[in-house]
């Protein structure tokens, strides 16, 4: 875990911030989702899957790319 000089888990803080933004944005950017996927630790995956599942469930026509992201996380 990368920590700054004060013991802060920078990776964890960035992941948490990105997860909040992805959850609150109606259509989160692919760049933001790519970055969070690069930074995810195994413990972070269930929260991210939950966020994506909520988006797919509430969208009348879920995007193909969002569905592909979910499927990629299951393999």
Q: What annotation goes with each model-predicted range?
A:
Residues 1-2, 75:
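Absolute protein N-terminus
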Residues 2-39, 61, 68:
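N-terminal acidic leader/helix
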Residues 14-16, 45-53:
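Amphipathic alpha-helical scaffolding segments comprising HEAT/armadillo-like alpha-solenoid repeats
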Residues 36, 45-48, 64:
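Solenoid-repeat scaffolds in large eukaryotic assemblies
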Residues 55-60:
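Solenoid-like repeat scaffolds
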Residues 66-75:
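Long, compositionally biased
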């Amino acid at each position: 875990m990368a920590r700054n000089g004060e013991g802060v888990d920078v990776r964890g803080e960035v992941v948490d911030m990105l997860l909040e933004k992805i959850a609150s944005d109606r259509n989160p950017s692919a760049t933001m989702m790519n970055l969070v996927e690069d930074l995810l630790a195994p413990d972070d995956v269930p929260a991210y899957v939950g966020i994506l599942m909520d988006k797919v469930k509430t969208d009348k026509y879920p995007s193909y790319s969002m569905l592909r992201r979910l499927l990629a996380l299951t393999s």
